[in-house]
């Protein structure tokens, strides 16, 4: 493989990693430092979806943004539906950082927020 083919993927990974770190940092600020109101819940959900998108870009930098957005949407919807089982809440009670990845309770509004955030990122 030539160097010129590796460089764009490498650059895309570096950019995705930096943006992912920034997104996770913002998410933690929203989660820990701001009041727990609807606006921060919406912001946190949007940042979660964006973080998932960036993580997929980090793993697969050659995929098209639309395909990456689709994978991120499937993950976000799957995690939200998984919350209907009560397992994420139980895991979060034992290991609280898991709540940041798995959430706790199902909220249909979250599904809309994930999809809107991903549509904006992909556009």
Label every PLM stretch briefly.
Residues 1-123:
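Bulky hydrophobic segments
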């Amino acid at each position: 493989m030539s160097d010129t083919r590796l460089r764009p993927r490498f650059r895309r990974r570096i950019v995705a990693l930096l943006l992912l770190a920034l997104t996770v940092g913002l998410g933690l600020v929203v989660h820990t430092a701001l009041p727990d109101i609807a606006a921060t819940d919406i912001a946190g959900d949007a940042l979660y979806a964006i973080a998932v998108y960036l993580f997929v870009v980090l793993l697969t930098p050659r995929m098209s943004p639309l395909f990456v957005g689709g994978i991120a949407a499937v993950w976000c919807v799957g995690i939200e539906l998984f919350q209907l089982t009560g397992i994420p809440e139980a895991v979060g009670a034992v290991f609280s950082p898991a709540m940041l990845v798995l959430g706790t309770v199902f909220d249909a509004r979250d599904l809309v927020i994930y999809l809107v955030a991903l549509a904006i990122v992909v556009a």
